[in-house]
A protein has these predicted regions:
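Structural preference for beta-rich elements and adjacent junctions enriched in aromatics
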Residues: 1-175
Length: 175
């Protein structure tokens, strides 16, 4: 997870993109092996702005209307933050739960000022599932300016995804 896209590194990946603003699109590449799912977020910087990726995973594709244990929120900014069964889990009892490293997943963080690519790898073991061909998972992405203020901006894929409702997320088929 170095934040550098080597020649051919992502040629075998699926890709989606979503608009942030006119002329600003974020592209997300995804691929996997038997142990990990890998993501590459490109276009996280534009005209002096920076966005930070979040990955929402429903590994058993339960498509519940509200969060349940086993559904993951993974956030990459100056630290890695995660929630199992809840989004936006930054602290508990006044103590930060975010760190530079987390068991079962990794990313190139904190991103340097010039970092334009965020790479993430998540183990299937972290998600509590084993890989099997043609498995389907619930999946959504968002990028946020991570200000922590009321006006914090967030952009989603799929566009209709709601962070609080796994039922609204997309479905990924891992072949």
């Amino acid at each position: 997870m170095d934040g550098v896209k080597s020649a051919g590194e992502w040629d075998d990946a699926a890709m989606t993109q979503f608009a942030v603003a006119p002329g600003w699109n974020v592209r997300v590449f995804a691929k996997h092996d038997a142990q990990y799912i890998y993501f590459d977020f490109e276009g996280v910087t534009h005209a002096g702005g920076r966005l930070f990726p979040e990955i929402l995973v429903d590994p058993r594709k339960t498509q519940s209307t509200a969060w349940q244990k086993g559904q993951w929120w993974l956030h990459v900014s100056n630290n890695l933050c995660e929630g199992n069964g809840a989004p936006n889990v930054y602290e508990s009892k006044g103590k930060s739960l975010c760190t530079h490293r987390k068991p079962g997943w990794d990313a190139n963080n904190p991103p340097d000022a010039g970092t334009e690519i965020i790479e993430v790898k998540i183990s299937f073991a972290k998600l509590g599932v084993g890989y099997s061909p043609d498995m389907k998972i619930g999946l959504a992405f968002d990028v946020t300016d991570a200000t922590g203020k009321a006006g914090q901006k967030t952009y989603n894929w799929p566009a209709s995804a709601k962070i609080d409702s796994p039922k609204t997320w997309g479905v990924a088929v891992l072949d």
